[in-house]
């Protein structure tokens, strides 16, 4: 595993715990600040950083829409709100940054079925862990809730990684791109 992949993993974990534990302990601003710092460092290491920023912004919007829908339909609950709060939105670009070139999950844009499987398993696991740590509440039927989240993430994760391949790295898989890379 490369140093960039290890740093990608560390950024993912640090951002996730800052968002979830910050929200659970009454510091909902903490996670977005940590994620913003981590993403700033991430973007600084990417070729085509303007495209990366654009893509991370798209991912944040997608995350806001998805989580707001889950909240509005009662799949998830966060007391006092029916729209996705900033700490929950921040988790989306934090996760998707690991699919960038050199990142922990950089092979996902070339493997949409693996991306779907990761979404189907990892999404529910993350939401369940967030609920166990007190940041969110799951709907009244835990297994149904996790199944819904799994289906949503099984669709959204491969869609986002395929979008990454189109928006950020349209030539990432050609030999000319690899030769031009430092």
Where are the model-predicted features located?
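Aromatic-rich, lipid-facing transmembrane alpha helices and their immediate juxtamembrane interface loops
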Residues: 1-182
């Amino acid at each position: 595993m490369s140093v960039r992949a290890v740093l990608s993993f560390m950024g993912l974990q640090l951002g996730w715990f800052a968002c979830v534990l910050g929200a659970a302990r009454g510091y909902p601003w903490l996670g977005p600040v940590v994620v913003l710092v981590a993403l700033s460092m991430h973007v600084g290491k990417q070729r085509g950083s303007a495209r990366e920023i654009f893509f991370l912004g798209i991912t944040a919007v997608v995350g806001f829409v998805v989580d707001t829908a889950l909240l509005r339909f009662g799949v998830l609950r966060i007391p006092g709100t029916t729209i996705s709060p900033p700490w929950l939105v921040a988790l989306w670009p934090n996760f998707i940054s690991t699919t960038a070139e050199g990142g922990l999950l950089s092979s996902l844009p070339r493997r949409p079925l693996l991306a779907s499987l990761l979404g189907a398993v990892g999404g529910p696991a993350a939401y369940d862990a967030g609920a166990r740590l007190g940041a969110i509440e799951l709907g009244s039927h835990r297994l149904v809730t996790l199944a819904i989240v799994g289906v949503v993430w099984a669709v959204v994760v491969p869609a986002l990684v395929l979008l990454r391949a189109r928006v950020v790295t349209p030539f990432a898989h050609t030999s000319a791109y690899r030769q031009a890379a430092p």
